[in-house]
Swiss-Prot record:
Region of interest (Collagen-binding), ranges: 151-318
GO CC terms in record: extracellular region; peptidoglycan-based cell wall
Database matches in NCBIfam families: LPXTG_anchor (TIGR01167)
Lineage of the organism: Bacteria, Bacillati, Bacillota, Bacilli, Bacillales
Site (Autocatalyzes isopeptide 631-715 formation): E692
Motif LPXTG sorting signal mapped to chain: 1151-1155
Sites annotated Autocatalyzes isopeptide 728-805 formation: E788
Species this chain originates from: Staphylococcus aureus
Protein name in UniProt: Collagen adhesin
Known partners and oligomeric status: Interacts (via N-terminus) with type I collagen. Interacts with host C1QA.
Autocatalyzes isopeptide 915-992 formation (site feature) positions: E975
GO-annotated biological processes: cell adhesion
Annotated propeptide span(s): 1155-1183
InterPro entries in alphabetical order: Adhesion_dom_sf (IPR008966), Collagen-bd_Cna-like_B-typ_dom (IPR008454), Collagen-bd_dom (IPR008456), Fibrogen-bd_dom1 (IPR011252), Ig-like_fold (IPR013783), LPXTG_anchor (IPR019931), SpaA_PFL_dom_1 (IPR041033)
Region (Disordered): 1074-1150
Length: 1183
């Protein structure tokens, strides 16, 4: 064989083998059509915080090139450097009416849309892809920093600014946070970050964690990272066991069924160590918008207040990704309806389709109606060939259309695609008007309640429906008219719209103010005051004078009626009414509070007075008389909380002290009567008066001693007032553009609730002052803040009471304030902070704010767009934090004064019991008509009830607060001393045993030490009973098991013919506490121990556990320090500890599985085979 022939044959063989391989590869080469087919690329928002999210939206169509099988559109972003973007892994199908024509794949490094062969059947293709990405600013700096990341698709690009906040100097002790990793969108990561500053703690640390719906705990992912004096890392199945061994006394309890984790760390190990417990939850509901995790903490940092069950909840929003495509298929009519000016799609436009010749269109219908969807698209498929007419028959207001215009088109059997058309509508210049509603009050009440108006419209059938997007208007006291602006005058048919209002509550629910009736008539609402609820006080005069034996009984007596201690009426009572009296038509309430009525009697000569309720008994005691004193408080119902719980008064005889004193308090209705007084001295009539012994700070005292039957001691206190002044500053180059308004409205908020508004003008040099404001509310200082109603073209900045308005045409600002309606956090349920988000025209902006005490629960967003698509933007807020037990109401009426109110009704309880008599059915007739039962809250007397046979000797204290500052109140009962009876108290059952000559005494211990905050309270104390000031040797131990109370029984009632007075003294000296003993009533002796917390000594560092082989500390050099709440930093997979002994089973398995490398490898072997064949043939040829 010729050598050249051999070479030629080998070449041909090689060419035949290789050529098909390369041709096959070229047949499936995909095109990147990003530059030709992408029409727009945007991000929203355009500025985010480090670790925050933004939404990328890319739109495309086929106007610049037909889209084919295998074509791709790519979106790229920076994946390294100081600023980078990470996508969240998602795959979203692209469908047309249920048929998939491609898919969008989002990865951490980019997004790609790939089309399949089904897209080639479509024409007029347009679509979009929308997905979230995370932005990171990795600049190594402690100062604030902005970095710009550019996202591209073909020749389109958009920028997002990633802001890194200034590093803080302090941290919170505990917070709960979470996130979703870009590469793992099927799980949520959660972090419990405990003792972040490695502080010394005074108590054990307890954390409770409850995973909410839509997710399930994956225990295999749990790991614990400890830094500090006992640094270590625990992960895997044995993480909890290893941790508990290393930290004796610690406990981590996991309940997979309930989705809960409970953590306890002893005080010793909790000090100087920081703990981060990290785990993942598997998402079980992919459609859920957000995932919530609730957590509570109990701890106490050294020198700080104890935290008991404070909530630390966190929400992670699900990752959103969406994509869509539109096109026409054969036999399909598709209409796109859009705004002529803005090109925005118009929904709810109705069209009528018919054949030109009037024949059936399809399905035996000669006319078919189609309506546009939210994307402005209306379509119908499978139309037979023929000539058609499309007519628009209805469009939403304010769009106009020509009812007579026809849109003809033709469908042919030879067509490969359907018919697509775009129809544009212009907005009509709509007639608008302002609608005003009026409030009419009929009645005498000076202070009117706050009510709300909701606007409705009425059709021809008298059906009423709420006006869409009309604000609920608030009418505070003094406001009688409200207006809605720019409302349409006519409906879509040109008929005038009839507007009317209804009276509602803040939530928009129908309501009527308490104490009023209402009448709604169009745009006028009239509230008529109901007749004032009245009561009557009746009683009788009883004479104990042997039927006026000595003829001393007067013809009449004067009975005085006192309302809350102040004399308001007097009646002369005579025998004509059988000595009975009645005060009628008395107001039952004063400013919503029930009036306490009592009676007294002007002094009756030769008689001693005894008052029992409204029964006044006069006993003929020649030579004796009585005197009655009443305390009257004039302090605006104790507004500032300065009123004492009791005061002491002394009786004077002709100006000289008698030594006879009395304690006046709520339990005796602030009144007392002295009996058995000498009527004369040295032949002269004695005048009895009173003086107040208790000096009440801040009060002035006036004593009315005119009538010793009605001595009145008035204590007057003028509540403290304050004023709030400030100024309006204009930053607008001295009103250069003439946009400054003539006035602005400044709102005053008291504890977050708007109470007053002032119009501020240039006449006062733009300064303002709210005067005569109450400084306190129920004893607690009021926190005043100011806001401002929105000022067009200006951005507002509030610093204290200085309000600066900067002229920023096209920009505006929004201010939010949190208002708590929870009785000053009585139950301790209020969180330390809440998170709110700003909305623009009903859509979330991603702009959030944390509201807490440090910023007075208020925040202002500045630099906001004033308009969007030529329309004024309305900014509102929504609360992101779900506060358990609270209802939320958001007042979005004015974006300069957005108010989020959280209302919580404190829990109440009741204490009921009964009085049992052990006296042989009152054999000796000594049983009193009534007894006084005292209610003690945590050892302190708070209420007293008179118990009688009318209630079968049963009693009940209702509507009692269940908690005080978040701690459950311990209620107990005692009883005022009952003569000739011994008292035994078992829970709330009070038994009185008739023991003539014997009595009893009850002592209760009251602790005033902030619920034993510093742990100094002893477990028990010892008290001793005293008889007339002398120790009896009778002692008692008081502790928790006996509710810190004890009763001595079988005590002598008299000694040497005189009534014995029993008192107590405390034998136990409690270090750091001061002791006060209230010995006023031996049925209710109270020993109070008060403790003022002191700063503890320098703590001793705990020793490290003496484990011989502690776990090896992993290398965390690459670990990112936890960021503050709501900014969880990404922890790379490489940061997790690895077992270096594990090797891959097969190194080849680690190689990328690409078709090109397989082909190259195969070609290499073909070459070797051919070369071998060539050498064999050549050898034979040569031989």
């Amino acid at each position: 064989m010729n050598k050249n022939v051999l070479k030629f044959m080998v070449f041909i063989m090689l060419l035949n083998i290789i050529t098909p391989l390369f041709n096959k590869n070229e047949a499936f080469a995909a095109r990147d059509i990003s530059s030709t087919n992408v029409t727009d690329l945007t991000v929203s928002p355009s500025k985010i915080e480090d670790g925050g999210k933004t939404t990328v939206k890319m739109t495309f169509d086929d106007k610049n090139g037909k889209i084919q099988n295998g074509d791709m559109i790519k979106v790229a972003w920076p994946t390294s450097g100081t600023v980078k973007i990470e996508g969240y892994s998602k795959t979203v199908p692209l469908t047309v009416k249920g048929e998939q024509v491609g898919q969008a794949v989002i990865t951490p490094d980019g997004a790609t849309i790939t089309f399949n062969d089904k897209v080639e059947k479509l024409s007029d293709v347009s679509g979009f892809a929308e997905f979230e990405v995370q932005g990171r600013n990795l600049t190594q700096t402690n100062t604030s920093d902005d970095k710009v990341a550019t996202i591209t698709s073909g020749n389109k690009s958009t920028n997002v600014t990633v802001h890194k906040s200034e590093a803080g100097t302090s941290s919170v002790f505990y917070y709960k946070t979470g996130d979703m990793l870009p590469e793992d969108t099927t799980h949520v990561r959660w972090f419990l970050n405990i003792n972040n500053e490695k502080s010394y703690v005074s108590k054990d640390i307890t954390i409770k964690d409850q995973i909410q719906g839509g997710q399930q705990l994956d225990l295999s992912t749990l790991n614990i990272n400890v830094t500090g004096t006992h640094s270590n890392y625990y992960s895997g199945q044995s993480a909890i066991t290893d941790f508990e061994k290393a930290f004796p006394g610690s406990k981590i309890t996991v309940d997979n069924t309930k989705n809960t984790i409970d953590v306890t760390i002893p005080q010793g190990y909790g000090s100087y160590n920081s703990f981060s417990i990290n785990y993942k939850t598997k998402i079980t509901n992919e459609q859920q918008k957000e995932f919530v995790n609730n957590s509570q903490a109990w701890y106490q940092e050294h020198g700080k207040e104890e935290v008991n069950g404070k909530s630390f909840n966190h929400t992670v929003h699900n990752i959103n990704a969406n994509a869509g495509i539109e096109g026409t298929v054969k036999g399909e009519l598709k209409v796109l309806k859009q705004d002529k000016d803005t090109k925005a799609p118009i929904a709810n436009v109705k069209f009528k389709l018919s054949k030109k010749d009037g024949s059936v269109v399809k399905d035996n219908q000669k006319e078919i109606e189609i309506i546009t969807d939210a994307n402005g698209i209306a379509n119908i498929k499978a139309l037979p060939s023929g000539d058609y007419i499309l007519k628009e028959i209805e469009a939403p207001r304010p769009y106009t259309f020509d009812k007579d215009k026809e849109y003809p088109f033709t469908m042919k059997d030879t067509d490969n695609q359907g018919y697509f058309t775009t129809i544009e509508n212009a907005k009509a210049i709509e007639k608008t008007k302002d609608v005003s509603a009026q409030k009419v009050w009929e009645g005498t009440q000076k202070v009117k309640p706050t009510i709300y108006f909701k606007l409705y419209k009425q059709d021809d059938n008298q059906n009423t429906t709420p006006v869409d997007k009309a604000e609920i208007k608030k009418l505070e006291d003094g406001t009688t008219k409200v207006t809605w602006s720019n409302l349409p005058e006519n409906d879509k048919n040109g008929k005038a719209i009839k507007y009317l209002v209804k009276e509602v509550n803040a939530q928009g629910e129908d309501t009527t103010p308490e104490g009023y009736t209402k009448k709604e008539n169009g745009l006028v609402v009239t509230n008529t005051e109901k007749p004032i609820e009245t009561t009557s006080i009746s009683g009788e005069k009883v004479w104990d004078d042997k039927d006026n034996q000595d003829g001393k009984r007067p013809e009449k007596v004067s009975v005085n009626l006192l309302a809350n201690g102040e004399k308001v009426k007097t009646l002369d009572v005579t025998s004509e009414t059988n000595w009975k009296y009645e005060f009628k038509d008395l107001p039952k309430y004063d400013e919503g509070k029930k009036i306490e009525y009592t009676v007294t009697e002007d002094h009756v000569k030769d008689y001693t007075t005894d008052i029992n309720g409204t029964t006044i008994t006069n006993k003929y005691t020649p030579g004796e008389t009585s005197a009655t004193v009443t305390k009257n408080w004039d302090d605006n119902n104790n507004q500032d909380g300065k009123r004492p719980t009791e005061i002491k008064v002394e009786l004077y005889q002709d100006g000289k002290a008698t030594g006879k004193t009395a304690i006046l308090n709520e339990s005796n209705n602030w009144t007392h009567t002295w009996t058995g007084l000498d009527e004369k001295a040295k032949g002269q009539q004695v005048k009895y008066t009173v003086e107040e012994l208790t000096k009440v700070k801040g009060y002035t005292t006036h004593v009315d001693n005119n009538d010793m039957g009605n001595l009145i001691v008035t204590n007057k206190y003028t509540p403290e007032t304050t004023s709030i002044s400030g100024e309006k500053v204009w930053d607008d180059k001295d009103n250069q553009d003439g946009k400054r308004p003539e006035k602005v409205s400044v709102n005053l908020l008291a504890d977050g609730e708007k109470v007053k508004t002032l119009d501020v003008t240039s006449e006062t040099n733009w300064k303002y002052e709210f005067k005569d404001l109450p400084k306190y509310d129920e004893g607690k200082k009021i926190e005043y803040t100011v806001t401002e109603d929105h000022v067009k073209d200006y951005t507002t900045d509030i610093n204290g009471t200085t309000i600066t308005n900067k002229y920023t045409p096209g920009e505006t600002s929004a201010t939010v304030t949190k208002n708590w309606d929870d009785n000053n956090n009585q139950d301790g349920k209020r969180p330390t902070e809440i998170k709110v988000e700003l909305y623009q025209d009903g859509k979330a902006t991603g702009k959030t704010a944390i509201l807490n005490e440090s910023n007075n629960w208020t925040h202002t967003w500045t630099g906001l767009d004033e308009k969007a698509k030529g329309q004024q933007v309305k900014y509102t807020v929504e609360e992101l934090t779900k506060v358990k037990g609270y209802t939320t109401h958001v007042d979005n009426n004015d974006m300069g004064n957005l108010i989020v109110t959280n209302k919580y009704t404190p829990e109440t309880t009741s204490i009921s019991g009964e009085k049992v008599w052990d006296d042989k059915d009152n054999q000796d007739g000594k049983r009193p008509e009534k007894v006084s039962v005292n209610l003690l809250a945590n050892g302190e007397k708070v209420k007293t009830l008179d118990v009688t046979s009318e209630t079968n000797w049963k009693y009940e204290f209702k509507d009692l607060p269940k908690y005080d500052e978040g701690k459950k109140i311990e209620y107990t009962v005692t009883e005022d001393h009952v003569k000739d009876y011994t008292t035994d108290i078992n829970g709330t059952t009070i038994t009185n045993k008739y023991t003539p000559g014997e009595t009893s005494a009850t002592v209760t211990k009251n602790w005033d030490d902030n619920n034993n905050q510093d742990g100094k309270r002893p477990t028990e104390i010892k008290v001793e009973l005293y008889q007339d000031g002398k120790a009896t040797g009778k002692t008692a131990i008081l502790n928790e098991s006996n509710n810190w109370t004890h009763t001595w029984t079988g005590l002598d009632e008299k000694a040497k013919g005189q009534q014995v007075k029993y008192t107590v003294d405390e034998l136990t000296k409690v270090n750091g506490y001061t002791t006060h003993v209230d010995n006023n009533d031996m049925g209710n002796l109270i020993v109070t121990n008060k403790y003022t917390p002191k700063k503890p000594n320098k703590p001793i560092y705990p020793e490290k556990p003496k484990d011989k082989t502690p776990p090896t500390k992993p290398d965390h050099s690459n670990k990112v320090k936890p960021t503050p709440p709501d900014k969880p930093s990404k922890v790379d997979k490489d940061d997790q500890p690895k077992d270096n002994k594990t090797k891959p089973e097969n190194p080849l398995k680690e190689l990328p599985k690409t078709g090109m490398k397989i082909i190259t490898s195969w070609i290499t072997w073909v070459f070797i085979g051919i070369l071998g064949l060539y050498l064999i043939l050549r050898k034979r040829f040569n031989s």
